[in-house]
Amino acid sequence: GLGDVYKRQVPLIVDNTFATPINCRPFEWGADIVVHSTTKYMDGHAGAIGGAIVDSGSFDWTKHPDKYPGLCTPDESYHGVTYTERFGLAGAYITKATVQLMRDLGAIQSPQSAYYLNLGLESLHVRMKRHCENAQRVAEFLQQHENVSWVQYCGLPGDKYYELGQKYLPHGSCGVVSFGVKGGRAAAEAVMGRLKIASIETHVADSHTCCLHPASTTHRQMNAEELLAAGVREDLIRYSCGLEDAEDLIADLDQALQ
């Protein structure tokens, strides 16, 4: 829990890509730093690759200078500045992340990509509501389908994360549903091949519905034992609901599962 994090004297960093700030605000639950892949819902249209780091400025790095020498001792590669002294707790981490990532990796968006991202952010609150509504309906449909062996979506009562979802994500989680197809790997691959609306891709969290069979794509080099250890079942399909009409998505899934 959160207490264990602080006992170990480390900041709590939360990846809020799927929930977005619309559905979850980690700082209100004790997080110190939040990260996002803005390529996903924030952009929403697969138009611009990007990421974001948001620092609450709440973690006291100076209490544990031995653990964080990069923030608490002079940085000889940047004019000998000590970030905690120069920028305080509110600016030490994010300043170091900004200046060093830009300098060493060129981690800054082009003006055109930033423009696309800003356009996406304008409609984020509208899109997230639709993504969540579609995912809830799709998950409920899959839960009742005779050819589906299991469904994981925290909006479903009975899901092992349902109570946590209600606590941290009261307005919905995201549009991504995971489910298993009866018949294992071969059956899951067959379902993927019959889908007509969803595109098969590793991308996720987009305005267009997309899906993935990890065992035969991203994790295809693993054997059955390694897949299980990685938490990837051979019957698993990851289905990312877009903004299409839920009835169309359900009809497409229904015909693919027959």
Task: Identify the role of each PLM range.
Residues 33-36, 42-176, 180-210:
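Active-site C-terminal subdomain of aminotransferase-like
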Residues 22, 47, 248:
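Residue-level recognition of oxygen-bearing side chains
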Residues 17-19, 156, 242-244:
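Active-site beta-loop-alpha junctions enriched in small/polar residues
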